[in-house]
């Protein structure tokens, strides 16, 4: 990083994407040494529950719902306490879901055992999670996170949607962070998409 900064100079941006889970934050980066050399860090605050997980959960929540659960706010709070300027911190949004099958209808499938099977992108939500196909939508107000459950198929899905992305954008503004990024643009809907939701909140402030 020192060599890159010397070559790039101060006018060119030098940044990187970092995992948003606590083990990575604790063990993988010497934050106090590298952040003075960097313009920003993009926190991948998604896949916090991923394809390796045998238990469902919010994969990109804004807030933790218990002491053990990872979240966007948990990562940001940790980095701010290290003294990293808020303007150098960028949070992440997921334009896709994580899904599991063989999930029991307890707590609407949330925090239950299951088998990960991937999940649809935001542009396909309206068809993939339709009521006619047996899906029900749920909002976790503590986590500020959306999820879906299909009792007939015993499937659970978690991901960002318009309400959760708006909540994240407001969080960025209120915390005076460096911004919000996402994976990835091609997964968004062409009309009334998640990027539109980010823009609406940003321009309304």
Where are these regions (language model features)?
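Substrate-binding surface in catalytic domains of secreted glycosidases
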Residues: 1-128
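Active-site and adjacent substrate-binding regions of carbohydrate-active enzymes
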Residues: 1-20, 42, 156-205
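Glycan-binding loop/region signatures in secreted carbohydrate-active enzymes
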Residues: 49-51, 95-171, 197-205
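Second-shell loop/turn segments in exported
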Residues: 60-67, 154-158, 184
